[in-house]
Swiss-Prot record:
GO molecular function terms noted in the UniProt entry: rRNA binding; structural constituent of ribosome
Gene Ontology cellular-component terms listed: ribonucleoprotein complex; ribosome
Protein name, UniProt field: Small ribosomal subunit protein uS8
One GO term of the biological process aspect: translation
Gene name per UniProt: rpsH
Keyword terms of this UniProt record: Ribonucleoprotein, Ribosomal protein, RNA-binding, rRNA-binding
Similarity field: Belongs to the universal ribosomal protein uS8 family.
Length: 133
């Protein structure tokens, strides 16, 4: 049986690995997950990512986490907003700020998967995938 929400699975794996200070975490490969990883890398929340093959030949997205020191984490929390049972869409002029601009919302738009700031600049709306701070 297939997975219902690969994005929520990815965010949960990153959140759990982050809490125990893992250097990297393997997540399910999907195009949207790769695009979310690109945005997280660009905004500085993760160190990087790679697409590798597992022993069965399936693609796996390996996300490299980063930490400022041994006690603190860069990602305080990462939450799914739009879910399969309740999609959340925003218009270009109605995009809310996450923690008054401190955090980042990742939005799937017609211009690709971008941050809330980029969506506001381009005045495009879309589906709010998740929030990170």
């Amino acid at each position: 049986m297939g997975m219902t929400d690969p994005i929520a699975d990815m965010l949960t794996r990153i959140r759990n690995a982050n809490r125990v200070h893992f250097k990297s975490v393997d997540v399910v490969y999907s195009g949207v997950n790769v695009n979310i990883a690109k945005v997280l890398k660009k905004t500085g929340y993760i160190g990087g990512y790679d697409v590798k093959k597992d022993e069965k030949g399936h693609d796996v997205l390996k996300v490299y986490l980063k930490y400022p020191d041994s006690k603190r984490t860069i990602i305080n929390d990462i939450q799914r907003v739009s879910k399969p049972g309740r999609r959340v869409y925003v218009k270009g002029d109605e995009i809310p700020k996450v923690l008054n601009g401190y955090g980042v919302a990742i939005i799937s738009t017609s211009k690709g998967v971008i941050t809330d700031k980029e969506a506001r600049e381009k005045s495009v709306g879309g589906e709010v995938l998740c929030k990170v701070w």
